[in-house]
Amino acid sequence: MKTFLFVNPAAGHHSAQRLQFVLERLRQHAIIPEVFQVRTPTEIYSYCDIINKEHEQCLVIVAGGDGTFNAVVNGLNPGSATLAVLPFGTSNVLAAEIGIKSIEDGIEKIVVGKTAYMSLGLLELKDRSHRFVLMAGIGLDGAVVRDVMPLGKRFLRQGAYALSALKCALAWDSSMFEISTPEGDVTCHSVIICNASRYGGNFILESQSTPFTAGLTAICVIGNQRRTYLRIAYDLFSGPKHHNRNLFKVAASAIEIRGTKAIQIDGDFVGHGPARISTEPDFSQIIV
């Protein structure tokens, strides 16, 4: 099988030595990938166009973080490649979600070759659409990601998000918006649309969500005060054993976002509402 490897030199855990280690380990198992060094989504999309023109299905290895993987699935055609991930990024939520503990573990799984079908979320804005692997965040979550400074993300890593959250807390926006699902309408201050169980690392936000089955879960924050989020953060850190009255969950295959709140997908800001979110079942196979 023809193999391609996307590597982001700007990823949080990238180094030339680490990349060389990956290539040597793959070559030991007769896997010799064509390497694409990429820094921007535009570069990723141009290489994905090459892969989309291949007549046979390829193996595409993504050595980067969640943002790099997101750009790859937005550039590829459905079913055009079997995907694999190596956790090179600042945040490697997808790797944790599918049970990849380290770069070495990811290589071993590639060699074994076990796969599962992966379903994605699809965000549709007025003039464009984006796929997402893990989650979409609307409201405060989207605003925090929007206001992260690129240099801060590079050098402070997760600390850059904490600084942005502090900025949003100081300039608090208490306004609400609505989401609409087949189950009804919900008024909320923020909403996380989950296609996976984890959020922001290894925090389990919705244990029933997984990219291996089609379907989304909306986690709606129905309180609009700062202390609401302090309680939610406490529950995330401690592993909640009880129902949080400020959260309302609804499972849905289609969700309409009303209003003009900020939106992020897989940790990258993409725009403002209104928007529509749906699922893209069995987009591709992924190495597990």
Question: How should these model regions be labeled?
Answer:
Residues 6, 29, 78-82, 86-189:
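Catalytic core of DAGKc-family lipid kinases
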Residues 66, 191:
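Short conserved active-site loop signatures built around small residues
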